[in-house]
């Protein structure tokens, strides 16, 4: 797992915790912030996956030429 993907997963986990604490405490602002953090983490994860895919394709094409 790349560092980018690892950090994205941490962002998602942190967001889930914030959202949960917001729900428990009745703090809608914290709950919303947690939801935003989860979505941001998911977007970062998708971008990291896309980068890994492109790197893999480039490596495969490079090996094909040899």
From Swiss-Prot:
Cross-referenced Pfam families: CsbD
Task: Extract the Gene3D superfamilies matched here.
Answer: YjbJ
InterPro entries documented for this protein: CsbD (IPR008462), YjbJ_sf (IPR036629)
Entry's family note? Belongs to the UPF0337 (CsbD) family.
From the Swiss-Prot or TrEMBL record, give the protein name: UPF0337 protein SPy_1261/M5005_Spy0972
Species source reads: Streptococcus pyogenes serotype M1
